[in-house]
Amino acid sequence: KDTDRSLFPDYYLQNFHHQTDGYLSDHSAGLYDLQVEILFNGTADAMRRRVLAPLKRGLKHFSDRSPSSLRVLDIATGTGRTLHQIRGALPHAELIGADLSEAYLRQANRWLNNGQSPLVQLIRANGETLPFADGGLQGATCVFLLHELPAEARQNVINEAWRVLEPGGVFVLADSVQLADSPQFHVAMDNFRRVFHEPYYRDYIADDIDARLIQAGFEAVTAETHFMTRVWSARKPAQPST
């Protein structure tokens, strides 16, 4: 059936990665993981795994709780590759994946909910307006999304992550390296933007993600570079003890 394009923000309806159907088709969803692995010379899953250690460290804030009571959201989960890795690291947590694309969620469902492991909840949602109550999640991740967004949407996603996290909750981002931390890759970044048709990448690589996290209200912001990926970890301030 045809996709109702009125459901999507304007930036989402552009061509991405030279695909005229962007993120809206099962064909695109079926190709995505192969494309990314080719692009990163087989290291994409290894770079996604870099979110696991800071996520687990951050969740130690809730170590007095049952592991099954922890709720972790993967924003823009796509085909579910990151969620699959999180499930391996946090086998008892309640995991949720949110994405705008029904086609990508179908692909994620085939990949994740195959009857061999606990089910992962997958919902269609915009990362700028997440359908969750304030403070109901203990962890959130967002992998390879920010470079696909215009600047205002980037901030909105980070603000929403702050809103849905419980005080003390952890937010882990992973995305492309940037000019400030990896100037030696300037030419590669420029070629990536042009060759792979990334309309917002030029703005992203000059953006200050640390400042955006702090603007949203996060603290304890840290960042590390691993090959072509930058990983940020931040905490929503815990409520003072009474």
Give short role names for the model-derived ranges.
Residues 1-57:
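Conserved Class I S-adenosyl-L-methionine-dependent methyltransferase catalytic core
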Residues 155-167:
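A short glycine-rich, Lys/Arg-flanked "PGG" loop and its adjoining helix->strand segment in the class I
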Residues 128-140:
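A short acidic, Gly/Pro-enriched loop at the edge of an enzyme's catalytic core
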